[in-house]
């Protein structure tokens, strides 16, 4: 039972630490593990019920509270939570499809990604972590996507933007570091519609990247501030490095 109670203590710590407004990755780790912690709570509850003679009811109630705590948050990001969607009006533009992919810089399966583009045929596609190898390989796609903007980097923060629509205006932002870009791409369609695509890829808080979430949080806050200034229909897309379950 020592192991059982040790796991419970770990569950409690990982659940409570993110409630503190500390940007160190240790405090933010629990945010990324919410799904795991929810299932861990279920397993611990099940084990406790099976061994009810050894596990006090108060422990089971505590585990149930943590299960509800995590499940309530995750539920908002599932299909069970129906979000209100505005009906398409008569003067709406035609549908636009966008495909965004973090291709993982060290992945060399170029053809598999290109087949994905051929299959889905999006109007716009974006690659994140794309370096010079990916830029060269994806040139075969430029016949169908003549409008491009390329930020080729070898630090896993490269970005490449490909579009069937003309790029009316494009800005590169470096909100938190001079080697971590974000893109602000303005479109003006023939029907007269204006919209903006904002591509972001801030660094995550982790032992191997950033010791805290300051750069990630700063990047996302800077993007939010910029969105208020733009005051146009905007799509924010990319790898936000917040939590996988959202």
Positions of predicted regions on the chain:
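Hydrophobic side chains within alpha-helical segments
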Residues: 39, 73, 219-222
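N-terminal signal-anchor transmembrane helix
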Residues: 50, 67-119
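Residue-level marker of positions within ordered structural domains that often coincide
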Residues: 21, 35, 76, 167, ...
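Soluble catalytic domains of enzymes that build or remodel membrane lipids, polysaccharides, and related
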Residues: 98-99, 104-118, 124-246
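Membrane-embedded alpha-helical segments of integral membrane proteins
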Residues: 2-49, 63-70
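Membrane-interfacial entry segments at the cytosolic side of transmembrane helices
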Residues: 53-62
């Amino acid at each position: 039972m020592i192991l059982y109670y040790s796991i419970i203590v770990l569950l409690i710590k990982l659940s409570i630490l993110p409630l503190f407004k500390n940007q160190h990755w240790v405090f933010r780790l629990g945010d990324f593990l919410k799904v795991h912690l929810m299932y861990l709570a279920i397993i611990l509850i099940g084990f406790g019920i099976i061994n009810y003679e050894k596990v006090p009811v108060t422990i089971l109630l505590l585990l149930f509270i943590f299960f509800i705590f995590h499940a309530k948050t995750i539920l908002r990001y599932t299909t069970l939570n129906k979000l209100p969607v505005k009906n398409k009006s008569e003067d709406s533009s035609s549908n636009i499809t966008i495909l965004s992919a973090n291709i993982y810089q060290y992945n060399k399966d170029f053809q598999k990604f290109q087949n994905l583009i051929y299959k889905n045929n999006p109007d716009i596609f974006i690659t994140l972590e794309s370096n010079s190898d990916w830029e060269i390989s994806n040139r075969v796609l430029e016949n169908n996507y003549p409008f491009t903007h390329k930020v080729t980097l070898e630090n896993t923060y490269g970005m490449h933007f490909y579009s069937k629509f003309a790029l009316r205006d494009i800005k590169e932002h470096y909100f938190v570091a001079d080697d971590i870009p974000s893109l602000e791409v303005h479109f003006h369609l023939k029907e007269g519609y204006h919209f903006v695509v904002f591509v972001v890829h801030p660094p995550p808080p982790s032992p191997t990247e950033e010791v805290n979430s300051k750069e990630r949080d700063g990047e996302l806050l800077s993007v939010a501030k910029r969105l208020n200034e733009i005051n146009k229909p905007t799509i924010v897309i990319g790898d936000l490095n917040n939590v996988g379950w959202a």
